[in-house]
Amino acid sequence: MVQGGVGLWQTPTSRMMPEGALSINYTDNNEYRFWSVSMQLFPWMEATARYTDVRTRLYSQVDSFSGDQTLKDKGLDVKFRLWEESYYLPNISLGFRDFGGTGFFESEFINASKSVGPFDFHVGLGWGYLGHQNDITNPFCEVRESFCTRPEGFSGRGGKVDYQNFFKGPTAFFGGVEYQTPWPNLAFKAELEGNNYQYDRAGRLEQDSRWNIGAVYRWNDFDFTLNYQRGNTIGFGVSYSLNMNSITQVKVDRAPRDIVNAKPSADVASINRKRLYNDLVRRGGYFINDTVIDDKQATFYGSQTSYRNADEATQRVGRILASELPESITEYHIVEHQGNILMLDTVIDAKAFREHATYSVPEPDIASTYKRVAPTDEQVEAFAPNRTSGAFLSSKFFWTQSFGNPEDFYLYQLGILTTAGYKFNRQFGVFGSVRTTLLDNFDKFNYKVDKERAVLPRVRTQVREYVTQGTFTMDTAYAVWTDRLAEDWYYQAYGGYLETMFGGVGGEVLYRPVDSRFAFGVDVNYVKQRSFEDMTRFFDYEAFTGFATAYWQPEFLPDTRIKVAAGQFLAKDRGVNIDFAKRFDSGIVVGAFASFTNVSAEEYGEGSFTKGFYISIPFDLFVLKPAKGRGQFPWVPIARDGGQMLTRPSQLISTTELRSPFYD
């Protein structure tokens, strides 16, 4: 579909992509250009984010503000499957287009699809943009008179869901057919659309026909489209598709240890420890920090650095231990730590593991031979790491980007983030980071602070000042103390330059049982705003900010996590921040967040409230060797001052990820 998502040309269908599918799309339709990303988050839900370039209008009439850039607009679509197609009944879906912005293409629709051989037939009713033909009576108008007229414009400062507009006003019929040719890569589409183009943001457009036709050609993961619309306009487009469940990377890796022909040590004294430790690193990705071995039990304290899948990591390590340790040892303990704070004990039944790993039982199930538990107090006391202090230095690239700016649609900054630190003991360390800008086009900024009247303190809208102060910028410099409070409780205290725009002191406590679907934490912080003129100094603005946060992985929505944080934000507004994340089989995580506070849409300004999206991608999808770690790419349509949280450099939910993994 031209605007993104599964559809014909201008009209959606009730069809869905396979779960986990992601498509990146570009279409050119004369007066409009569309850039969009569509995702199939669940089998029954499709979502699309879109930028529209209105080529017949300027971004603004002020040349010093936006020059000759054409008007850009953001839009969000969502579609839900209500009924899955059967032999006799069609697929039925309900959808909302451009429901969370300025409403350029705001529409609601319900449609049905039925396949018959190589043909796929579609029919639907549309309201809003899809209903401007007004060729049938709005069925809801018969129920309540308020549905007969659709309100104009949008509420607040844009960015809000105008639910009061839903299914109101003119209604039109739309539909079409898709024909899959005998050539698998080629399909034809024809549709009757419901819009009359008399109310478009590009101006009143000529429509010689309601019929649109065209072809789709697929080459590998690309779709190329060519169409003829409105009886007078040629359009074209290209889409790239992948599946976030099935995407993989070929790995060059050592095979897991073969234990069928293994010759374990006769007793503890004869263990070849050098070979054991080397194998744990090279084949198991497990770096040892301390070991306690007796006649019945072996405990290995360390950290997994290569394999993000917990079962793969455990079974690789288990095979090595079963190959090297004497059979008199009945239990292996793989105790993992984060920053020398114990997090998790994976207990392996040695005899059962050997039997299942060598297929000596009728129905082997290796995962049933081990369990994950919290480290005991005895293990905490016995843990004597070979190194508790020392320095480190690391560097990585950073990429900052911004879409839809008045100066230029796409602004970017590329650089190197250099991080250094020193650990004094298990609990305490100091850390800092410096940004070095290598390449950017932020010099295109026509203004550093917008001219809107600031009702709230400018806690984020001065961001342009902070990112343009020079080639080298001190990003953070802070000290942190982290420790285990009790079996399922952790705490930390920190202070310093905590993020680019704020410094201060704070603390956090987190309750997180092993493999629990629930976690709960509280953080409290006192911060001052850093000076963008001298990053070592502060402005006068200060605030207390903190949240009570609940994390929940609901059983009825597999591979998802919901985070709800209630408290006070940086601008001293109060409310909640809600974050919803979905994980796919490849490890890719897609999420969305929004803040709802006691600040009105008018006080907040453009966008009405803080919201954003992100995608988190594991590094091992890009490299040939197994690797942990990931990169995150956020997209915040409008960032103003309300509903903004402190970006704390150390967060216990990340530190304790081992205890109930969601990201890894």
Feature annotation, model-predicted:
Residues 144-146, 151-161, 165, 169-171, ...:
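Flexible, glycine-rich linker and terminal segments associated
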Residues 41-43, 79-86, 116-118, 181-183, ...:
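Outer-membrane beta-barrel proteins
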